[in-house]
């Protein structure tokens, strides 16, 4: 029986509807963790004042480019900027790892007929979290590098790497073995993988644009809403990719 996008979409929506509460709770929980980690690791108010105190001087050179802007900063400002970037990157990475492991284990537990919850699914994913951490870090670096060069290489890399988290969890395979298998399967079934990845990327951009227009005065609440909706989209994509891999393996 051929694998069609309509079949995968229907199966994905059925699972999402049946497990909506657990998926929503997991999306919000990992969003809270991301925001809290980012807040805890970010520079203090005094350190941020170093950047804001000279914002008027730096704003005049924004048009010259990002690298020129960074070069014109003082060493103290560069250090604060690096800490901000590192905090945001690490917090997002931890949130993505917990979400990925939790969603994939939720699918497996439900498929085995076990009653589960968001917390139990995340806890059950503990043996895979370290491997997922390195995998997602590597995938993120590769995709962002591709996006910086040109958009198309980044999208192609996202497609190639899309099945690797599923393979790591279901097959308990190594990182590079999962990437190799994912690349082969993703491009062999491009009609099923490419539309899903492109829609996922577009949905994330749309969420960013829409949420930024909402009348929410609290930056923390805005961050939780943005991360929560983004996590929900990623969770649905993971369900789609898990179902696709199960059909391909069968």
UniProtKB/Swiss-Prot annotation:
Give UniProt keywords alphabetically. Answer: Cell inner membrane, Cell membrane, Membrane, Transmembrane, Transmembrane helix
Where are its TM segments located? 20-40, 90-110, 132-152, 156-176, 192-212, 222-242
Top-level division of the source organism's lineage? Bacteria
Q: Does Cell membrane count among this protein's keywords?
A: yes
Question: Record's InterPro entries?
Answer: UPF0259
Q: Family per UniProt?
A: Belongs to the UPF0259 family.
This protein is called UPF0259 membrane protein ECA2305
Task: Give the classification, highest ranks.
Answer: Bacteria, Pseudomonadati, Pseudomonadota, Gammaproteobacteria, Enterobacterales
């Amino acid at each position: 029986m051929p694998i069609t996008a309509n079949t995968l979409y229907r199966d994905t929506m059925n699972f999402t509807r049946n497990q909506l509460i657990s998926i929503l709770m997991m999306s919000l929980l990992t969003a809270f963790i991301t925001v809290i980690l980012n807040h805890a690791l970010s520079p203090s108010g005094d350190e941020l004042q170093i950047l804001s105190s000279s914002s008027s001087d730096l704003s005049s050179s924004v048009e010259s480019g990002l690298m020129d802007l960074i070069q014109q900063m003082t060493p103290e400002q560069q250090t604060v900027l690096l800490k901000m970037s590192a905090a945001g990157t690490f917090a997002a990475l931890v949130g993505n790892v917990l979400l990925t492991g939790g969603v994939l284990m939720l699918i497996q537990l439900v498929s085995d007929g076990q009653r589960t919850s968001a917390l139990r699914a995340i806890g059950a994913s503990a043996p895979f979290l370290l491997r997922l951490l390195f995998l997602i870090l590597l995938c993120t670096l590769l995709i962002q590098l591709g996006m910086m060069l040109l958009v198309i290489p980044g999208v192609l890399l996202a497609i190639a790497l899309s099945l690797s988290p599923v393979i790591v969890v279901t097959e308990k395979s190594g990182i590079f073995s999962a990437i190799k298998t994912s690349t082969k399967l993703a491009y062999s079934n491009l009609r099923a993988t490419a539309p899903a990845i492109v829609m996922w990327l577009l949905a994330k951009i749309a969420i960013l644009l829409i949420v930024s227009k909402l009348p929410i005065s609290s930056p923390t609440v805005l961050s939780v809403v943005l991360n929560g909706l983004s996590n929900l989209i990623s969770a649905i994509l993971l369900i789609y990719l898990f179902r696709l891999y199960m059909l391909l393996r069968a």
